[in-house]
């Protein structure tokens, strides 16, 4: 383990090393997410420090470390991964991290005293199945357990440590060369290459850095004829061209998956070797048995964390903690621009995009962009017509799960909210309040152009399109545009031939419901007038006649 005085090469050296490791980790992360999504985890892109290394960093360097780790975690979260927030991230999100009072070892995310009890050692080996517990180091400054004393648990140290070991014990070495050596070692570690050249150079203390000087001066003279991208050597160009041809030359023995890049194949094999504990149900691998035990809850349905307030249970402790904020009202994540607060950091991150105008998830069909991937998935269903959420009681299908949940409540709950004027009942008070506006003579939303009033703001917004001429709904078949979505949907049926409204008496079908209702009256042979004016009581057989009459009031 590197001694504290071995890290005294100045803030700029550590900062650049951290930035270089950030770039390397991000490259590794992108490759993994693109080609082998199920094996990447936060542990694979983490930067770890020993206690001695941490105490040697100044506040600026610790701040940089915080930014690197939070950004790596954000990169995983923003591509749609459902992550259990690591304790190191929760720790870094606290303001007091820079004081150095807490030391977190990211590899295990457990704080240890110098003398570990037998039960604690069993916990590290994964023999205790109820999750990992945390101990706090003593105030007297006792350090972390040494990796040599406790086997291989802390053997995968940062490449920075390996580079430092190869350096002679002197203060006047070239820090820029150290940075180059460190980045080279990190890349070799990611690619699974042997580090023999570094071990051979320990006697002299010399580590080759010519490759980096060549990379800095060499021009990118190999250009892809398909997309114009340039590369510094022909082998990189050949690897890139396989992305256009679809050729995958390197196959993994264990899972049979193929890759275009030998380095990526070696990387995946390395990741597989680092995760020997496999789930028998789905085959997912983990580094430690304790992580596997937590994962098994998804298969067994075990939910050990139960809320005392409402009885809801959770698989993971962090989900339970977030849920507890719904009862306490705690919202620790506050937007600096508008002051809006959130219970989760992910909610704040999504909200910040609304200020920046950043909508990274775009629909390939119509080009509409969204803040989150889940909203994009919901939108795509409007193109495909997919409705995967089906009510088991009545068979009605929905494109969004929340709509199904609201629909199920209508089956489960009695309609206790009854209108005293007309007797109509509703399952929710909010629905009754909306209904009451139809009885109230006062219409709160008035058009400034013509003075027409409406019960709902959405109705006023739709009405304003008459004055502005806005027609946002355009038919792709004939180019005709409409100001109302319902008119657009009815028009589309003229192209598809769909007639969903069929008369049970004669079998005649109609495109729109209004035509169907008028037709139904013709079968009754009575002058039924279901549309009654609430002002004077006069009744009409068609809604258009009622609307025409209401204008005189």
From Swiss-Prot:
Gene3D superfamilies: 6.10.140.140, Classic Zinc Finger (3.30.160.60). SUPFAM superfamilies: beta-beta-alpha zinc fingers, KRAB domain (Kruppel-associated box). A zinc finger (C2H2-type) spans 222-244, 277-299, 305-327, 333-355, 361-383, 389-411, 417-439, 445-467, 473-495, 501-525, 531-553. SMART domains: KRAB (SM00349), ZnF_C2H2 (SM00355). PROSITE patterns: KRAB, ZINC_FINGER_C2H2_1, ZINC_FINGER_C2H2_2. GO terms for biological process: regulation of transcription by RNA polymerase II. Coiled coil: none annotated. Pfam families: KRAB (PF01352), zf-C2H2 (PF00096), zf-H2C2_2 (PF13465). It is found in: Nucleus. Residues 40-111 form the KRAB domain. Keywords: DNA-binding, Metal-binding, Nucleus, Repeat, Transcription, Transcription regulation, Zinc, Zinc-finger. Signal peptide: none annotated. GO terms for cellular component: nucleus. InterPro entries: KRAB, KRAB_dom_sf, Zinc_finger, Znf_C2H2_sf, Znf_C2H2_type. One of its GO terms (molecular function) is RNA polymerase II cis-regulatory region sequence-specific DNA binding. May be involved in transcriptional regulation. This is Zinc finger protein 426. It comes from Rattus norvegicus. The gene is Znf426.
